[in-house]
């Protein structure tokens, strides 16, 4: 760890009316209580709060009046794969965008309050190309805004002026280690994962003191020789164990004082090329529950062993108190633990992997409760009543150059776009893609620079004509409430409101609202560019606003190859848009 006292970044304070300056001056430090019980008008984390619900209790915009939404303001942002979720704190929007930029913006007018731009001092050729322009999340705590950089730094900015408080170099940025999803704040600790798709080693999660940036702990995923799990890597040398990291969004449960994160797969994709035939590989595709102060692993559960298909299990899961009562007749049932206690329990639940399986665990102990399919998949062969996964042997690579057909693709099923969860109805809304693929291991020698070393051709699952999809599932029973499908790829995060709406973007450039009860499309508005940003909502002076950032179709463009009719996408015109209902006369 290195502390860079003289930052290469630049903060610019905008010169405007005193009212704008007052908004920044009046901001009070954000406390743990404030993050864990967010005031209704604020949005203080990627999923609004540390539990990652992606839900706001605001109810001014309703199914009955959503069609009246009008654009209030918009402003251009740096171009790139815009996947960001703005934070809103007492009328100030904090926005991270491509090209290592963080801005403070007046949330009611769109006026710039300050801007910080980080300047790389590493040759971009050495950096992780996948995370180049992706800033999904930033964090706020105390008086600071926290974000991670392309070259693997953790930076804290003063929220009032954008000046650097600290800059921590976590190391190996010039060897491809990076982060795209940003940190979570857990009881005074900044917890941050990492991505190393092109690296000849594994990655880690770190915990940092929120005031100083001091690294408190570092957890690796790939076992070294002699460590627990070493014998599950097929006798391969440590130098052959590549890429496993944790780049998805994390969740914090203040009741149990646990941070939950998930790990990714390894490379190359083919276990034949890895020299690990049949090896389950402890550490990959695993859900971890850790103590934020120390990094102590309290429990773990592997949700996709022996991964030949890049089915990374690193996406957010949510924590809530529910009435556990899994239905034996749930659609896509894989397994129900007959020994798991039903009734009131605090659970960790969600869709953590690209396979699209919905998993549920006891939040404190990790006891498996149930698992079910959502999207079409044929690579999980069996899950027993303890949640142990066996893969479908027919879909495992046997030789280089020999293709297999499998579902879903290495883009999901479900990928990183955020789910939304209504804690009142206990329904989770999951963005997915109907897609399968033919993948072939390349015959050239595997190398970290080639990542998974495969070729892929996408197609729709048999019997499907629509690529885009959103499922609503009751997490208490596991039963499907409704399913919304559309011709174009969705591949965009979701947001739910207390008034009964679900908002989403998509590759087709539409910002849309669905009815939470039925899945009916109620409203949509077409923006200049495709939408991968996370919708958020907030309230200032009694008025509710809806915000979304757009700018790129991302992998939605690749997935569109499955569609019969091509989507009208655009990667030009990156901007943040803010909508509201017209003032009553």
Task: Annotate the PLM regions.
Residues 7-15:
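Bacterial N-terminal signal peptides
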Residues 536-585:
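Blade-level signature of beta-propeller repeat domains, shared across WD40, Kelch, NHL, RCC1
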């Amino acid at each position: 760890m290195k502390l860079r006292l003289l930052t290469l970044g630049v903060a610019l304070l905008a010169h405007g009316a005193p009212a704008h300056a007052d908004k920044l001056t009046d901001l009070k430090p954000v406390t743990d209580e404030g993050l864990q019980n967010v005031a209704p008008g604020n949005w203080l984390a990627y999923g609004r709060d540390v539990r990652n619900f992606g839900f706001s209790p605001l109810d001014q915009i309703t199914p009955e009046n959503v069609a009246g939404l009008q654009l209030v303001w918009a402003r251009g942002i740096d171009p790139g794969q815009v996947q960001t979720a703005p934070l809103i704190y007492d009328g100030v929007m904090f926005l991270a965008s491509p090209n290592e930029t963080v801005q403070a913006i007046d949330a009611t007018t769109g006026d710039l309050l300050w801007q910080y731009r980080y300047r790389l001092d590493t040759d971009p050729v050495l950096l992780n190309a996948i995370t180049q322009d992706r800033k999904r999340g930033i964090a706020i705590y105390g008086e600071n805004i926290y974000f991670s950089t392309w070259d693997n730094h953790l930076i804290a900015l003063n929220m009032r002026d954008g000046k650097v408080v600290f800059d921590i170099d976590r190391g190996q940025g010039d060897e491809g280690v990076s982060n795209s999803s940003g940190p979570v704040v857990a009881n005074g600790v900044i917890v941050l994962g990492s991505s190393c798709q092109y690296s000849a080693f594994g990655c880690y999660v770190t915990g940092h003191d929120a005031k100083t940036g001091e690294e408190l702990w570092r957890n690796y995923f790939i076992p070294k020789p002699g460590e627990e799990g070493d014998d599950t890597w097929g006798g391969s040398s440590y130098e052959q164990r590549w890429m496993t990291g944790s780049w998805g969004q994390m969740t914090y449960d203040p009741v149990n004082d646990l941070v939950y994160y998930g790990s990714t797969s390894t490379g190359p994709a083919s276990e034949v090329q890895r020299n690990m035939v049949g090896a389950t590989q402890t550490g990959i595709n695993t859900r971890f529950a850790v103590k934020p102060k120390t990094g102590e692993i309290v429990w773990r559960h592997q949700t996709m062993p022996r991964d030949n298909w890049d089915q990374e299990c690193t996406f957010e899961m949510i924590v809530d108190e529910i009435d556990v009562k899994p239905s034996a007749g749930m659609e896509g049932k894989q397994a129900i633990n007959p020994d798991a206690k039903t009734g009131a329990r605090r659970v960790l639940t969600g869709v953590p992997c690209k396979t699209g399986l919905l998993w549920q665990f006891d939040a404190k102990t990790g006891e498996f409760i149930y698992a079910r399919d959502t999207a079409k998949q044929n690579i999980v062969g069996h899950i027993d009543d303890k949640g142990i996964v066996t893969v479908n042997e027919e879909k495992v690579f046997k030789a280089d150059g020999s293709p297999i057909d499998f579902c879903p693709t290495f883009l999901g099923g479900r990928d990183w776009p955020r789910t939304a969860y209504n804690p009142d109805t206990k329904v989770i809304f999951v963005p997915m893609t109907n897609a399968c693929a033919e993948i072939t291991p390349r015959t050239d020698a595997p190398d970290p620079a080639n990542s998974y070393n495969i070729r892929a051709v996408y197609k729709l699952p048999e019997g499907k004509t629509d690529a885009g999809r959103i499922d609503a599932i009751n997490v208490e029973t596991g039963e499907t409430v409704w399913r919304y499908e559309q011709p174009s790829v969705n591949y965009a995060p979701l947001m739910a409101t207390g008034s009964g709406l679900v908002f989403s973007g998509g590759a087709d450039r539409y910002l849309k609202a669905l009815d939470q009860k039925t899945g009916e499309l109620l409203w949509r508005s077409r923006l200049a560019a495709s939408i991968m940003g996370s919708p958020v909502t907030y309230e200032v002076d009694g008025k509710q606003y809806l915000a979304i950032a757009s700018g790129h179709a991302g992998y939605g463009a690749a997935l569109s190859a499955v569609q019969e009719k091509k989507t009208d996408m655009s990667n030009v015109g990156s901007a943040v848009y803010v909508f509201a209902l017209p003032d009553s006369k």
